[in-house]
A protein has these predicted regions:
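Sec-dependent N-terminal signal peptides
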Residues: 4-13
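N-terminal cleavable signal peptides for secretion/export
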Residues: 17-78, 93-100, 152-165
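Solvent-exposed helix/loop surface patches that form functional interfaces
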Residues: 25-27, 92-166
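Short, low-complexity Ser/Thr-rich regulatory SLiMs
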Residues: 47-52, 83-85, 108
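A conserved amphipathic terminal alpha-helix motif
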Residues: 77-89
Length: 166
């Protein structure tokens, strides 16, 4: 029985880090509008390009928050996620957040089976169970940690589902 459980774990474990790219095969673009207090303040676009087993997901985001007419928070960012089959193999982003430059350069190390990250807030390795925190990928809701798409920092998270849509 123990051998069966270990074998089952080894078969299922690699599937934790995959993005299920097939779920997005029919999409070439996802557009999200960003609202604050009912007012449109920006956008978040995802573009999907496929070539064989490779998928490139490009992300563009821009928004600004104003308070009493003054800009108090502003983000403009561009990022690229590259997948081979369902495995994220690289992620790169450049962001201007409140006039500060931030970045992430992530590579999948196939030898160690970890992500190597050079970012404006984090340099090091992390588990492939961590998900880049871009909202097109539903796996973000199942992960115990996410990689900031702006700075590369690792953020622990707990997601609690409060009910099913009826």
């Amino acid at each position: 029985m123990r051998k069966f459980i270990v074998t089952l774990f080894l078969i299922l474990y690699p599937s934790i880090s995959i993005a299920h790219m097939a779920h997005y095969n029919k999409y070439n673009k996802l557009e999200m509008e960003i609202f604050r207090n009912g007012e449109l303040i920006g956008y978040n676009y995802y573009f999907f390009k496929r070539k064989g087993d490779q998928t490139l997901v490009t992300n563009q985001i821009k928004f600004s928050v104003k308070l009493l007419g003054a800009v108090v928070f502003q983000v403009e960012s561009y990022g690229e996620e590259k997948y081979l089959k369902d495995q994220l193999i690289s992620y790169n982003s450049k962001t201007l957040q409140n006039n500060k430059e931030k970045f992430v350069n992530l590579l999948f190390n196939s030898n160690t089976k970890k992500f190597e990250i050079k970012g404006s807030s984090f340099n090091g390795e992390t588990s492939i169970d961590s998900i880049v925190g871009n909202w097109w990928n539903h796996k973000i809701l199942q992960a115990d940690s996410q990689i900031s798409p702006i700075s590369g920092s690792i953020k622990k998270q707990t997601v609690t589902f409060i009910g099913k849509k009826k």
